[in-house]
Amino acid sequence: MRRGPRVALVLGLLRIYLAQANFAPHFFDNGVGSTNGNMALFSLPEDTPVGSHVYTLNGTDPEGDPISYHISFDPSTRSVFSVDPNFGNITLVEELDREREDEIEAIISISDGLNLVAEKVVILVTDANDEAPRFIQEPYIIRVPENIPAGSSIFKVQAEDKDTGSGGSVTYSLQNLHSSKFSMDRHSGVLRLQAGATLDYEKSRAHYITVIAKDGGGRLRGADMVFSATTTVTINVEDVQDTAPIFVGTPYYGYVYEDTLPGSEVLTVVAIDGDRGKPNHILYRLLNESDGIFEINETSGAISVLQSPALLRREVYELHVQVTEVNSPGSPAAQATVPVTIRIVDLNNHPPTFYGESGPQNKFELSMFEHPPQGEILRGLKITVNDSDQGANAKFNLRLVGPGGIFRVVPQTVLNEAQVTIIVENSAAIDFEKSKLLTFKLLAIEVNTPEKFSSTADIVIQLLDTNDNVPKFTSHYYIARIPENAPGGSNVVAVTAVDPDTGPWGKVHYSIYGTGSDLFLIHPSTGLIYTQPWASLDAEGTSRYNFYVKAEDMDGRYSLAEVFVTLLDVNDHYPQFVQSVQEKTMVLGTPLKIEATDQDAEEPNNLVDYSITRAEPVNVFDIDAHTGEIRLKNSIRSLEALHNITPSGDYSWSLQVQAKDRGSPSFSTTALLKIDITDTERLSRGSMAAFLIQTKDNPMKAVGVLAGVMAIVVAITVLISTATFWRNKKSNKVLPVRRVLRRRPSPAPHTVRIEWLKFRRAKAATKFILKEDSPNENCNNSRVGVMVPPRAPALPPPPKMASSMVAQQTVPTVSGSLTPQPSPQLPTPKTLGGPVQSSLVSELKQKFEKKSLDNKAYI
């Protein structure tokens, strides 16, 4: 029952680890007019047919994993697009209408199965000429006095077109071209009485004029379309009466476009005499000062602009025009005033522009330390953005284009001008070791204009390093092997740690410590480990060392690695004969065995081969080269055969045996073995000797007999002790018995000088004749005094001899001797010719030599 949650927890942790090790996919940025990328700066005409393929999302995954695309919309809005998750093809599924919705917000995302990256995009809906002009404030019925001056403004019609650009610009014209009394300004829609034309109340009290409003045309579904609308203006002619001047066509609104030339006429104020009789002349003048920007014609009432509108800072100017009737002298002049509103119409002819401290600038650079605090402002960037247009034409958005989520820009929407502030969003992503240079584009794009003017500025951030990294070894452990006879100061292994930081922070200092580091040193700068100058390595004493190395930077940040050093055995020991026996007796058909040991640590240096180097006579004995067993030749099957081999006819033999190891160079030792040969019939004279000979091939029988004897001795001892105890108890006296056991001192070793003996005829029991410093028949004093080659420190004493070997030593008839004689040639110690090859160091698999590690623990 408990295994399920544990498995789920392990799978969850594994999934988190894999997600952290997996880098997120990202979109490709697209430029203006591109239909492939992340939909930045993407716009779509409103007349695009439903079902059209309008865009292709395009991105990539750093690991090359399969990616999928998605698009979503706010629940309160329409789902205008659909996307193919595999290929990123975006299809229009809802009809567009710019007049109702001029931009569409959507969230596009890209996923590699583990990571999901989402971006919010704004798709701009561009205009198509799908709207016709529409007259406002209909019907148009006006009253005009009959004495209105020729060229005067009579009325102003107004039509609007919801389209933008040329499709939203309206021009006016008259349909009844046969009528020559009236004309219309094609841009302003002002209806005027043509020059030279007059109105006559008596002849015609009303005039009907058809006005056509036509847009500038535009593209609609692939074709050029022009829409128009018509209306009728009814002009009722009034009889002139004796009244004050009357303004015609009020209210007065004038529009001056930004590209209008100085001196151009803006509008005409028309005032007439209200009298029905003979009209008086009207004079016009401006009551308020216009700062020299506008002037009015005294007689016609035409208002003109004197300065370039592009230089004007105000958007609206309010003027007051006064008209005065020119009467006969002495008559009071009738006057009237009217307000005139003139609006400066801004043309969207300025894109947003970035400014630095010295003027317009499209590249801004900054140096800063890595990992700044979250929310910190990049105060080194002095950026101002400005759009010289007015009103809606000067409204634009700001955004950063580049690696997402690192910085954000404030403000995001600007009207005319703003100071740009860039704030840190993701401090961890600002990493000197990952990227020394961060590059972004600061994008300013207009919001509510059909042109969508935009500009960009490059933001280049040069990162400065800080000590934010720990030195790391290239491996968690290092393994080296060096010969045991390497001289002091020999190179062992070079460890390497890397600190990604730069300058002093990236310098690594190495040190060494641990229980196995006494014999080693490390170079603090290079990481080279070498032996102490006085170090003497011995594989037979300690063959393996392990210790730790430390890599530390100047601020104390450090990491550790473990070093394993294995000493390679060198053949620096002679074989040594184990048994110190002078004589032996060989029973016909039973081999003798000699044994020598080599204290080298590894094969083949400690493997010993045996051979007979000298014998008199020859061709009597054979020796097994691997086990050291000595046998008679197969042709010798009886004592009589032996008796006839030599002139002396005896059964005593002398052999010189050599023990030679398999190392390179090879060392050897010789020993002299004296053998008496007998048979089982002669051994039957001694019961103990016969028993030992019989049980030689069955040692368990000897052990059983020995155990029985010991049991009997113990039983007798217990009985005697019990009887003594009860006797003393009856006499109320217990006498302690104290036995002092002393170990017999071992006899001092002495040198035995053995001469080669001539064989002579004797009885079978006759011994060899020896010449020695002090005659001794039972001790091994046959060691020849020659110089011993240098060798490693002594190993612990060898294990005790097996019981079978002891049994052989106790045979009463043993009369042979074994005399080790080392080879006169001394070994030449091996030295390292150079540093240990790095290929040996890199053999990491040596750490896993489990068989060796299980058998030999590190010291």
From Swiss-Prot:
GO molecular function: calcium ion binding
Protein's job: Potential calcium-dependent cell-adhesion protein. May be required for the structural integrity of the outer segment (OS) of photoreceptor cells.
UniProt xrefs under CDD domains: Cadherin_repeat (cd11304)
A Pfam family matched in the record: Cadherin
Extracellular side: 22-701
Source organism: Mus musculus (Mouse)
Tissue specificity remark: Expressed in cone and rod photoreceptor cells (at protein level). Expressed in photoreceptor cells of the outer nuclear layer of the retina. Expressed in mitral and tufted cells in the olfactory bulb.
Gene3D superfamilies xref list: Cadherins
GO cellular component terms, A-Z: photoreceptor outer segment membrane; plasma membrane
Record's protein name: Cadherin-related family member 1
Post-translational modification summary for this protein: Undergoes proteolytic cleavage; produces a soluble 95 kDa N-terminal fragment and a 25 kDa cell-associated C-terminal fragment.
Keyword field contains Cytoplasm: no
Location, primary (coarse class): membrane
InterPro entries assigned to the protein according to its UniProt record, in alphabetical order: Cadherin, Cadherin-like_dom, Cadherin-like_sf, Cadherin_CS
Keyword Calcium part of the UniProt annotation: yes
Keywords: Calcium, Cell adhesion, Cell membrane, Glycoprotein, Membrane, Receptor, Repeat, Signal, Transmembrane, Transmembrane helix
Subunit structure: Interacts with PROM1.
